[in-house]
């Protein structure tokens, strides 16, 4: 689905679910891309992106510092004009699924436009617990907003508010299975907010490497609320920022760092090799597991 007119938007709006099949693209020439489920705000409606989908609102560009692109919004419920302000929601599955199997590679590029993804699930008793997540990423995902912001909000009644990711093969080296990049220069560049009534708020799953990068000076905030477990669960994650603050709030459930660790600020060999970012990690319970050989927990910053 392609719009070539400069600044023209693509709006896909449904009163129920929205689902795409595999290997499909939605492309605009710097216009907005909006997927709006449950538009009548009655009875719910999820969003499912098929495997290997590409959303690009910046005329095909995919750079780290692009500007001028359109917004990309995945959500549901009430709204104004052509933009939903609520959540894509489901009582029988995940609110939003980014891919449907571990073989997936979801690509989202906004080229300076803001990216907003909101999903909610009240599902219970699913064969696969991951289908009870507010937002769940299957396989690999590359998300770049250029000079725009990235916001993800997920809520779940039973499993993870936001879950990253289910890889094709579980390895603690190799290609990043999550690469989330913003070059917003001020304010909040990346905000991930997840809550669960019976699970982890925001979870970075499995052994494979993942990265969340703020290249332009904006802040990174990860806020997780869990019940009976951690607010934020971390494994083999880089949270890097050139100068904007890095904030992690785990609430009463706290923050759990598993045996492949977490790296804050900057890291040699990454896209950010120097940093002046300040770091705040906050929670009632902060747990750091014994590290596997060759892995580290670190803060590399002059802040």
Please report, for each region that a protein language model flagged, where it lies by residue:
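Short, intrinsically disordered, charge-balanced linker/junction segments flanking boundaries
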Residues: 298-303
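Extracellular beta-strand scaffolds
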Residues: 1-6, 16-27, 32-34, 39-49, ...
């Amino acid at each position: 689905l392609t719009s070539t007119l400069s600044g023209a938007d693509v709006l896909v709006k449904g009163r129920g679910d929205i689902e795409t099949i595999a290997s499909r693209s939605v492309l605009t020439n710097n216009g907005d891309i909006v997927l709006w489920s449950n538009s009548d705000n009655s009875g719910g409606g999820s969003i499912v992106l098929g495997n290997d989908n590409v959303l690009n609102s910046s005329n095909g560009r995919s750079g780290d510092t692009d500007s001028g692109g359109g917004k990309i919004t995945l959500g549901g419920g009430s709204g104004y004009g052509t933009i939903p302000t609520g959540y894509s929601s489901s009582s029988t599955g995940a609110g939003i699924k980014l891919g449907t199997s571990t073989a997936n590679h979801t690509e989202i590029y906004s080229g300076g436009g803001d990216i907003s993804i909101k999903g909610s699930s009240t599902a219970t008793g699913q064969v696969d617990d991951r289908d009870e997540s507010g937002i769940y990423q299957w396989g690999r995902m590359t998300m770049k907003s250029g000079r725009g912001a990235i916001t993800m909000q997920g809520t779940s009644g039973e499993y993870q508010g936001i879950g990253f990711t289910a890889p094709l093969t579980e390895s603690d080296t190799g290609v990043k299975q999550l690469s989330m990049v913003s070059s917003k220069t001020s304010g909040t560049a990346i905000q991930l907010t997840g809550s669960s009534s019976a699970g982890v708020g925001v979870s970075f799953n499995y052994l494979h490497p993942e990265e969340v990068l703020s290249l332009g000076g904006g802040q990174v905030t990860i806020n997780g609320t869990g019940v009976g477990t951690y607010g934020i669960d971390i494994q083999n994650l880089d949270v890097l920022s050139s100068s904007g603050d890095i904030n992690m709030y785990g609430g009463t459930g706290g923050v759990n760092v598993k045996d492949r660790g977490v790296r804050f600020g900057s890291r040699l060999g990454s896209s950010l090799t120097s940093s002046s970012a300040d770091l705040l990690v906050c929670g009632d319970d902060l747990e750091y597991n014994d590290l596997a050989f060759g892995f580290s927990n670190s803060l590399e910053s002059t802040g």
